[in-house]
């Protein structure tokens, strides 16, 4: 058993010498040749880095005649480092003075008008003057303005009590227009009123469209104008089923060519024939005061419903029409 293991032992000795020589050749440099560590390196992991010296606030560097609109160009929350005023706010504790402006959250909650100084407003007006024109001399009354500009747009900007100057309600756009200012016939007007529902006020003849679906005010304005355009064009369309509408399907009672008009004309012609007076035509009978009163009472009774006033008007008009008074 000893003879076969001798070659293997010799081979291991040769490999050991080789590894020893390789390790000697690549041995690390001595301590004198090592690079010295940087002087700023911490000597201990528990030692803190030195604090950087805080800079003085901006208010101490401001000059008296500086350009204030460049400090507060737009609406922004209160910044104590940029306002050179000894502002204090808060509940005084133990009869002391309110808290100073540094780190005061109460000053962040309320809105400020530091961007709307008289100098800033004057600069804005001077910059916008080149883009403005004089008010037209012909538009000297509200009636003329409504005639030439019938569409009224209402928007609102809000001042919030908080660090943010944005308010989600500012995107809401309200459009108002009178239907009398639109080019609509009787069919188109009734159909448009049916389409808009309770957005139309009959007493003022005003259509109100309120949009708040889009995130931006401009988008809601475009959407409101789009809705008005679609409603206008849809109201002028006449569908096939609309041609088959009867008197009972109408939105409001119409006297012209109605059964009531035909019946009253037939009755009046019979009365005139009995009196041997056939000279009056249909148009002349309809233009008499008695027939006009009867027509108005019937229309009121049909559209407003049965009440004491409409029934009384109808009774009196029938008496005058048949000469029973």
Curated annotation (Swiss-Prot):
Q: Which UniProt keywords apply?
A: Mitochondrion, Ribonucleoprotein, Ribosomal protein, Transit peptide
Q: What is the source species?
A: Bos taurus
Q: What is the lineage of its organism?
A: Eukaryota, Metazoa, Chordata, Craniata, Vertebrata
Transmembrane residues, as ranges?
none
Protein name, as recorded? Small ribosomal subunit protein mS35
Protein family membership: Belongs to the mitochondrion-specific ribosomal protein mS35 family.
Coiled-coil stretches are none
| GO term, biological process aspect, one | mitochondrial translation
Return the annotated region ranges for Disordered. 27-62
Q: Spell out the disulfide connections.
A: none
Give a Gene Ontology cellular component term annotated to this protein: mitochondrial small ribosomal subunit
Pfam families attached here?
Answer: MRP-S28 (PF10213)
**Protein's cellular compartments:** Mitochondrion
**Which GO-annotated molecular functions does the record name?**
structural constituent of ribosome
**Superkingdom, according to UniProt?**
Eukaryota
**Known partners and oligomeric status:** Component of the mitochondrial ribosome small subunit (28S) which comprises a 12S rRNA and about 30 distinct proteins.
């Amino acid at each position: 058993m000893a003879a076969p293991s001798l070659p293997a032992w010799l081979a291991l000795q040769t490999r050991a010498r080789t590894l020893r020589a390789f390790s000697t050749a690549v041995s690390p440099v001595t301590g004198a040749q090592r690079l010295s560590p940087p002087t700023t390196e911490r000597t201990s992991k528990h030692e803190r880095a030195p604090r950087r010296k805080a800079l003085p606030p901006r208010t101490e560097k401001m000059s008296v005649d500086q350009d204030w609109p460049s400090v507060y160009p737009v609406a922004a929350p209160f910044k104590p480092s940029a306002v050179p005023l000894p502002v204090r706010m808060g509940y005084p504790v133990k009869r002391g003075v309110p808290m100073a402006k540094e780190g005061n959250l109460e000053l962040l909650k309320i809105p400020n008008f530091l961007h709307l100084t008289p100098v800033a407003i004057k600069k804005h007006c001077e910059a916008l003057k080149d883009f403005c024109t004089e008010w037209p001399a012909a538009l000297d009354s509200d009636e003329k303005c409504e005639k030439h500009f019938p569409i009224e747009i209402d928007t609102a900007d809000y001042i919030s009590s908080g660090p943010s100057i944005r308010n989600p309600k500012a995107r809401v756009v309200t459009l108002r227009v009178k239907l009398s200012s639109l080019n609509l016939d009787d069919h188109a007007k009734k159909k448009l009123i049916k389409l808009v529902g309770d957005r139309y006020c009959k007493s003022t003849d005003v259509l109100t469209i309120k949009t708040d679906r889009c995130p931006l005010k401009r988008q809601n304005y475009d959407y409101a104008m789009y809705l008005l355009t679609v409603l206008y064009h849809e109201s002028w369309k006449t569908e096939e089923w609309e041609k088959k509408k009867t008197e009972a399907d109408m939105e409001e009672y119409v006297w012209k060519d109605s059964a009531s008009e035909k019946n009253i004309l037939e009755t009046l012609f019979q009365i005139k024939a009995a009196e041997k007076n056939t000279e009056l035509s249909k148009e002349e009978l309809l233009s008499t005061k008695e027939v006009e009163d009867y027509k108005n009472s019937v229309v009121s009774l049909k559209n407003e419903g049965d009440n004491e006033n409409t029934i009384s008007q109808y009774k009196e008009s029938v008496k005058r029409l048949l000469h029973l008074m």
